[in-house]
């Protein structure tokens, strides 16, 4: 089972200079609750951003895979050079956690989308390429002020 998890605003904005364009504790708590201790896949920029955020603390994931076209020896992660081959052949639960290129490369292979819809419009420079969410089935939805947590099944 492959999951992808991200937050986006009304314009499908997901980032600003390699960080989130917002700081909403409920969204951060949801992301942590969903991914903590899990096997994750992310791009190199996302990895470096998280390492900067957590500083000396270990990242809160089980197994960590980092997509990079270059061969890199990460101290706490395995390098993945061919993301598409990796997700097509990976047999266990996997959480795709960013960034944009990794989401878009893996989207055809993802079984469940966990999207936090951040109500409103924010400033940033990284937008998710639009796709038809209606091709997915909404299987779970929770609303709180300013956010909609939605899970979609392929």
Language-model regions: role of each:
Residues 1-154:
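Enzymes that bind and transform nitrogen-containing heteroaromatic metabolites
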């Amino acid at each position: 089972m492959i999951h992808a998890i991200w937050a986006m605003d009304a314009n499908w904005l997901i980032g600003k200079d390699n960080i989130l364009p917002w700081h909403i504790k409920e969204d951060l708590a949801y992301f942590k609750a969903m991914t903590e201790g899990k096997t994750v896949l992310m791009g190199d920029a996302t990895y470096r951003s998280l390492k900067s955020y957590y500083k000396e603390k270990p990242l809160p994931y089980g197994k960590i895979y980092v997509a990079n076209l270059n061969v890199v020896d990460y101290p706490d992660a395995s390098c993945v050079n061919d993301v598409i081959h990796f997700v097509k052949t990976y047999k266990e639960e996997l959480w795709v956690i960013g960034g944009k290129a990794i989401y878009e490369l893996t989207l055809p292979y993802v079984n469940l989308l966990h999207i936090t819809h951040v109500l409103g419009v924010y400033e940033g420079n990284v937008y998710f390429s639009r796709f038809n969410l209606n091709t997915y089935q909404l299987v779970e939805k929770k609303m709180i002020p300013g956010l909609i947590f939605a899970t979609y099944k392929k």
